[in-house]
Amino acid sequence: ATLAQIVNHNAWPRTSPGEVRRRLASWLESQGIDTTKSFDAVQGAATPRTAGTTDKTSLSEEENMLLKKQVLFPATKKAFGLFRDPFADEAMQGSDDVFTTPDIRYVREALYQTARHGGFMAVIGESGAGKSTLRRDLTERINRENAPVIVIEPYIIAMEDNDVKGKTLKAAAIAEAIISTIAPLESIRRSQDARFRQLHRVLKDSSQAGFSHVLVIEEAHSLPIPTLKHLKRFFELESGFKKLLSIVLIGQPELATKLSERNMEVREVVQRCEVVELLPLDNNLEEFLTFKLQRAGKQLTDIMDASAVDAIRARLSNPGSHRKNMVSLLYPLAVSNLVIAAMNLAAEIGVPQVNADVVKGV
C-alpha cells in the first residue's frame, strides 16, 4: 500500500521519507537498474508530499467528490454484466427495494404507527441517510394496505427559517394545506379565527368518518422556532380524547439542535416529540452492498472483493475531534456514489473486480 501511494500519488511516508527512498534505491540497484534518474520523473510530475498532509484545495476536491452525483457508465454496465444501475433512485420501485437494518426497521415501523394511531415524532439524519426513502415507503405502505390515513404534506420548496433566505412556513400555511387536503372543495376562510375553526371542523368530520391524519414536513430543520411552537398546538387539536392530527418532522441534524432540551423556547414541543436518528450503515455496509447488487441480479463477489469493502469503510470514516473517535459517513448515498465511481474506474482500467487500490484511486 505504501509503494502504491508513492508510485500513484507521489505520497511519501510521514516518518523517515529519506530512509524509504534510500532503501528503494538500494533495491533497484541490486536488480541492475540505474537509479540516477529514477525519482526525477516523479519529482517532475508532482511536488513530493508526505502522507497525512493535504492542502485545503485537495481536501476540498475530495469532499466535493464525495458529494457529487455519480452515474454508472454504459461501458461499466457492460463490463460487469449489469442491465441497470443498482444504486440509482430509479432502482427503488417499491418497498421490497428498501434496505433495512434493525435501526431502520424501528424507524420504519414507528413512522407507520405514528401515522396510524397518533403521535409526534422527528426523524433526524444526515444528507443521504435515507430519510426521504422512508417517507416514500410510509406513503407506499399506507396506499398498499389501504389504511384509513390521510397524509398531509405542505409544500416546502422555498422554505427557510427566516424571510431573508426564503419564505418561512407559518401556521396559517399549514392550516391551508390541511384544509385543502382533507376538504379540497371547501373555500378557505380569510380571517385567521374562521380559518382555524374551519380546520378544526374538517378534522373532526374526517375523524368521525374513520380517518386518521398525519402531517409530514420534510426539511424540517428549516422550520422557524415560532412554527415549531405552533405545531404543539396543532397536535393538541382533539375530539374528546382522540387526537385529530399526528405530526412527523423529517430533517437534518440542525433539527436536533432546535429540539434540544436546553432550548427553552421549544420546551413544550421537546416534552411531546419523540426524536429518532438514522445512523450510518457501519457494520451493515457489506449487507447493504449485497442487497443492492442482488436486486440487480448480481452477487457482491461478482463486483468487488473483500478488500474493497474495507477500503470503502476506511474512505468514509474520518477521525473526529478526539483521535479515538471516528466520524462515520457511511450513509447510503455517500456509499453508492463511491461504489459507482470505483466501478467506473475499474471498468476504465480493465480490472475485473473492484479492489482496495481501485477505491483508493477514486
Show the residue positions of the predicted features.
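C-terminal alpha-helical "lid" subdomain
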Residues: 12-57, 64-65, 294-362
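A short, basic N-terminal segment
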Residues: 1-113
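The catalytic "switch" region of P-loop NTPases
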Residues: 160-161, 211-213, 233-315
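AAA+/P-loop NTPase substrate/partner-engagement loops
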Residues: 143-177
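Walker A/P-loop nucleotide-binding motif
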Residues: 116-137
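Mid-core helix/loop region of P-loop NTP-binding domains shared across ATPases and GTPases
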Residues: 65-79, 167-230, 238-242, 281-285, ...
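Post-Walker A helix-loop "phosphate-sensing" segment adjacent to the P-loop in P-loop NTPases
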Residues: 141-150, 184-185, 239
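Phosphate-binding P-loop
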Residues: 111-118, 207
